[in-house]
Amino acid sequence: MFTTVVLQQVEAGELSLDDPLSTWFPDLPAADQVTIDMLLHHTSGYPHYTEIQSFLDRLWANPFQHWEIQDLVDIGVAGGPVFTPGTDWLFSDTNTLILQQVIEKVTGRSAGELLQEDIFDALGMDDSTAAFDANWPSPVLHGYSDERGVWEDVTNWSPTWTYTAGGVGADQEDVRVFLDALGDGSLLSPELHDQQFAPTTAGLGPWTDQQYWAMGFLQLDGWVFLNPGLSGYYGAGGTIPEEGWTMVVYTTPSQGGDQSAPTATDIFRQFTAVVTPEHSLEQ
């Protein structure tokens, strides 16, 4: 969702896809080489901060703590890019948080305000929140996890360790509404919609012309696909705009459950073989 917010600001003339990061944050590693486009496509080379052990140690020690976005960015960029920016692909939530900082700087508005006004309100998504706190509106699906060595309710863990990279809450119907708007381009100009969907990352990392990372989502054999996840939760959603198919799946782990049990993504893939065999994602 936040990628669309970024592109809306590009459309408004607040920034350009070719702008270097040094325009706003010259002290970040390789800031003169990394562009807004690279952050959106995950070709900056900045590591995925959620896979860095020092971050995980702090997170598991106190999952209720409030994180400052700059602390997370600092962890993610500490070692600099792992490849020359623009030459390879690596998914990294560090990119998303840097984009959040940029957008908040150029607009003078918080990411939560932008999501609420320009996405949720615009689409009538009344059961969505970007407050980035643990006070989820009721009723809320409870998530559980044993990642800290004990089975526990993780519903009220602080989502500030993700911000716009995963701290948005929405029910399945609101996710469907957003996916439909993402697919039909109703939130962007035709030009930016085309750029958002272009196979720019094809040939980088694992991506091809048929399966690639677009701006903010995966394009998989015709499916516009998202698979967000947090501790205690799995999500998968996708749409085929040309055919009018949209599916959203949420799952949570079960105590003592089979670790190989299907996740939301597994279930989604299985259903694609039933509803659209010609676009099946089942391996």
Regions inferred by a protein language model and the residue ranges of each:
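Active-site SXXK
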Residues: M1-D18, L99-E104, V175, G244
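A general structural signal for well-ordered alpha-helical segments in protein cores
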Residues: F2-T3, I36, I69, F268
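Hydrophobic "lid"/C-terminal helical patch
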Residues: V6, F178-L179, F271
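Short, glycine/proline-biased beta-turn/loop segments that scaffold the active-site neighborhood
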Residues: S16-A31
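Short, surface-exposed loop or secondary-structure junction motifs
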Residues: D32-S231
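Short, well-ordered beta-strand elements
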Residues: A236-G257
